[in-house]
Amino acid sequence: MEESINPIISIGPVIFNLTMLAMTLLIVGVIFVFIYWASRNMTLKPKGKQNILEYVYDFVIGFTEPNIGSRYMKDYSLFFLCLFLFMVIANNLGLMTKLQTIDGTNWWSSPTANLQYDLTLSFLVILLTHIESVRRRGFKKSIKSFMSPVFVIPMNILEEFTNFLSLALRIFGNIFAGEVMTSLLLLLSHQAIYWYPVAFGANLAWTAFSVFISCIQAYVFTLLTSVYLGNKINIEEE
């Protein structure tokens, strides 16, 4: 399998991965267009495109609200909707096509097949939970709940680290493996003409399975985000 390289540019000490940046902007654009299109001319009795949006919205609220609680859900409902849609699209982009130049420069892939990208997403999720904890409960109460009793501080630190790491590695492992397998099947189809029907059928079946796994991973990522956030903002005070 040919090695692919994502194009990068440097602005001072900051390095930008152009493929990841382009894919992220594309995903944000698709989500904006979808929500804008589906929310135009909404009626009390939903139909057509409005049904699609409301179904996805109700689905996301259904599995996140038990963790956040009805008290705060209205403040985070749109965040979880957009996060779920973002992860679904990001996980499946690499299954749609492959754009790679002769020199191995890759211009199209799932952002979540990149470990650095997943680590960044995971870090932002953990950071968000702490920011919201401070905003909802105050700095002193947030620190107190994290450091009291004193002997559990190492365990709390370890828990935050494992949450961060597992959230990133879970999504990376599944999506990266899916793209690698797809590339291998495509490579098989170019070995000989008699391998083409086999590779085509196998790739079709694998793509369908990968789409299912990608959607499951988007569900798990959003669910765990709601769990981590709920644990931070719903702590009962003694």
Curated annotation (Swiss-Prot):
Q: Repressor: is it a keyword of this entry?
A: no
Q: Which GO terms describe its biological process?
A: proton motive force-driven plasma membrane ATP synthesis
Q: Where in the cell is it found?
A: Cell membrane
Membrane-spanning ranges? 15-35, 76-96, 111-131, 167-187, 208-230
Q: What binding partners and quaternary form does the record give?
A: F-type ATPases have 2 components, CF(1) - the catalytic core - and CF(0) - the membrane proton channel. CF(1) has five subunits: alpha(3), beta(3), gamma(1), delta(1), epsilon(1). CF(0) has three main subunits: a(1), b(2) and c(9-12). The alpha and beta chains form an alternating ring which encloses part of the gamma chain. CF(1) is attached to CF(0) by a central stalk formed by the gamma and epsilon chains, while a peripheral stalk is formed by the delta and b chains.
Return the similarity comment: Belongs to the ATPase A chain family.
Task: Indicate what this protein is called per its UniProt record.
Answer: ATP synthase subunit a
Tell me what gene encodes this. Answer: atpB
